[in-house]
Amino acid sequence: MLDVNNFEYMKIGLASPDKIRSWSHGEVKKPETINYRTLKPERDGLFCERIFGPMKDWECSCGKYKRVRYKGVVCDRCGVEVTKSKVRRERMGHIELAAPVSHIWYFKGIPSRMGLVMDMSPRALEEIIYFASYVVTEPGDTPLEKKQLLSEKEYRVYREKYGKNFHAGMGAEAIKKILSDIDLEKETQELKAELQTAQGQRRTRAIRRLEVMEAFRNSGNEPSWMILDVLPVIPPEIRPMVQLEGGRFATSDLNDLYRRVINRNNRLKRLLDLGAPNIIVQNEKRMLQEAVDALIDNGRRGRPVTGPGNRPLKSLSHMLKGKQGRFRQNLLGKRVDYSGRSVIVVGPNLKMYQCGLPKEMALELFKPFIMKELVSRGLAHNIKSAKRKIERMAAEVWDVLEEVIREHPVLLNRAPTLHRLGIQAFEPTLVEGRAIRLHPLVCTAYNADFDGDQMAVHVPLSAEAQAEARLLMLAAQNILNPKDGKPVVTPSQDMVLGNYYLTLERENAVGEGLVFKDINEAMIAYTNGYVHLHSRIGVYAGSIQNERFTEEQRKQLLITTVGKLVFNTILPESFPYINEPTKYNLEIETPTKYFVDTTTDVKTHIANQPLIDPFKKGILGNIIAEVFKKFHITETSKMLDRMKDLGFKISTKAGITVGIADILTLQEKPEILEKAHDKVEKITKQFRRGLITGDERYERVIGVWNAAKDEIQNKLILSLERLNPIFMMQDSGARGNISNFTQLAGMRGLMADPSGRIVELPITSNFREGLTVLEYFISTHGARKGLTDTALKTADSGYLTRRLVDVAQDVIIREDDCGTDRGLTIKAIREGTEIIEPLEERLEGRYARKTIRHPETNEIIVKENDLITEDIAVQIIGAGIEEVSIRSAFTCNTKHGVCKKCYGKNLATGTEVEVGEAVGIIAAQSIGEPGTQLTMRTFHTGGVAGDDITQGLPRIQEIFEARNPKGQATITEVAGEVVSIEEGRDRGLEITIQGVDDRRSYTVPYTARLRVEVGSMLDRGEALTEGSIDPKALIRVRDVLSVQEYLLAEVQK
């Protein structure tokens, strides 16, 4: 038997007929399977015990030999060897075919290997194999060519003319004859000679043929083995047959396919023995060929063979390929022991690195550990009694369990695992009930909520696995997102709302302008109702535990609110006191304008100061990032827990609720609608007079309604109170956005119909007033589309991720420095005038390609091949430098991967990337993970031609597949100045560009939106109109690097 676990390497090759016979333990001659009365396998059939081994351990078929003592005896009555029944999983049989058949993989695969070796087209091969044409195998001294195809009629004519002077045949036999005659050495030499001269199509074909020839030579396989004389039969346990209740049998499809082969093969043998007419024999040979094809790969050629209920049968190939095949389903997707799953609920009192594990689950998962501990403590005499104790759930078991799980991390995983933060490690704490408790802050990383989500638990067993889980995978270690280095553990929902409410300021609140000696005094006053949480007050700066205040400031009063005093207690002491949501306050110090002399009249001072914005979600994220930068992981995770607790506590105390009275309708709404109706009336009149086209009318009507909706939205925002609960929820970033609010209180606006075209009848009502029946009906289109899109999008996005991982998985950091002298010049990414990604964000964490000097003082900002930190990036921007040459993975010289310097820093840890880091997979996940959130909709600006610019997920796929994009932009092939834009001779606008040595004109449709005007200076390959550039066109006009840069910029959008 094979030793499955111990091998050096694995090689897959063609099997020769002798090899197949050597695997086999006997020939299968009959199509019978199991006798339905005795339930014993039929002799010489597909389940024969003599060939494949006994059905029962140590027992022959007829029952003459039973027991282990007869091991290895071959029964003289039934011929079955006495051995374990497990051999039925590994013993193979074979079928001796009455005529050779072609293996469909080699004849039908792409490219057809058989066709390449014989230098024939797959079409011709098919005609020969399926007995439609003859092929000349030996031309003799006739004018025929070898491998020439002859029809039935031509064959008869030539037979009469030349008699026995030439040989021609059909079917796999003829092909086998030709394949046997091929001299690989000679063919290889001829092909190499041909490569010297050949061009174009002939050259590519020669290269492909040479590859196959070389492969045959090097592997020692014979081309004629692509034709089968013997068919292997796989072991019966792999294609089982079981009896169901009611006496019926369930069987694997393979048995049906094998039976068809055996039946046809036996019939062919009989016909050959009888000496039947050629036409009948040929037909039978063709049927045998088709039966073998169906067995190996059903449905590859012609209609698949179907079983009961018109279901295509699963052939050998189907068993292996695809998601449900052997590899992806069973070898890569095994079920694992020491795992469990349950519903998750929130655990607000957990620490960042903890999770709550239900007691019963922990007992089952840690069973072996508990049993060992029980025995070693002497609480149980042996493993068996320890097991009994656990099953009875004795009292001492729980104490041992507490001991065992201490410092033993478990892994929590939520499907779908879209990026590496979908599996993290936690220290378990035991909880009552049957639900897993999850820390609220890690929900963002898992994309989890508590509406019934389930999660799986896995126990790392070995010491190494535990160490790895603790050091690399602990939730407290994974604060930054690997895709952009920003914190992924940000407070959400209630936590955001609590901290927002805490840091609000109100005018003329109770106790405004009071002065306190320290935070304790202020808190006593607050508790007793002398001062409000939002009141602006003065506090002696010296009493605040903050190392950032200067000596001067410590003697002054700090103007702040009670809430901000509380908020600042969660931050580390050496962090600036945060009084306003600005970058300056976060990174450098509290602005001096908040300090006043102790002699100041605080009340009047405050009354003249504007209110400061409260801290919204974004600022909380920035605070976390800043704390992480200065204090690293441990301190950050403690601070996060404090922020979470404070947020929950305050949002509970604030008692923010939503009632119908909080939705205030707009007084001016009727007149805005009135105006819009008038405008639409005017546009329709213009259309009736023929002044504008139908398309233009539609566009303008939609424009009018969008403008009306925006006006209502803007007026709504202005009319809202700062303390309106719905406004606070939206403003803080806890939940909802302004358009939800507009739909509640303003108007719902325009809706799209199922095809995605916008219906020009707007929904003028809002949810507060209620919709009319027609409006409700129009709304249902959009809702339905939303649901179907989500379902389709998830599958698409997952498939995109899978393809990305497939191409990027070999990209690993291989060395420290590849020593390249090339780099990539980068500048801020812009879309029109708007900056999508500023230069400093692109620079931070990369290595400089050239030494960068200050343009005025000429001092060195950063040396070449040094890391550009955030501070250096700010200096570069401050010096007014707009483009910088950096080391980039595009220009890295490392073979099979990238080097440290070209990659830059590891965003997930904020430190230098280490050799061996699988950066390709991180990149693939970072693109694939947000794919689920991208929209599927192709936005239509009213369905005008040339304006369907694809966005979202389809656009990303378009870029990676390098397809011809939808809504393609016209690009210029010359560099120069745009001299004129005028109406062309035929439809459209003509743009003329004067280059250095020539002049070119491009015609674009009228509806295209132009990106250039007369006098614009253009580079080669720049777009003249809005839209996506075809990368293949760009590479013709410019170099590879510019295409890489264009694709990079597009993906970043």
UniProtKB/Swiss-Prot annotation:
GO MF assignments: DNA binding; DNA-directed RNA polymerase activity; metal ion binding
Q: What reaction does this catalyse?
A: RNA(n) + a ribonucleoside 5'-triphosphate = RNA(n+1) + diphosphate
Protein known as: DNA-directed RNA polymerase subunit beta'
| Top-rank taxon, per record | Bacteria
What lineage does the source organism belong to? Bacteria, Bacillati, Bacillota, Bacilli, Bacillales
The GO biological-process annotations, alphabetized, read as: DNA-templated transcription
UniProt xrefs under PANTHER family: DNA-DIRECTED RNA POLYMERASE (PTHR19376), DNA-DIRECTED RNA POLYMERASE SUBUNIT BETA (PTHR19376:SF54)
CC annotations in GO? DNA-directed RNA polymerase complex
The species this protein was found in: Listeria grayi (Listeria murrayi)
User: Which positions bind Zn(2+) 2?
Assistant: C818, C892, C899, C902
Query: Is Transferase there in the keyword field?
Result: yes
Q: What is its EC number?
A: 2.7.7.6
Please provide the record's keywords in A-Z order: DNA-directed RNA polymerase, Magnesium, Metal-binding, Nucleotidyltransferase, Transcription, Transferase, Zinc
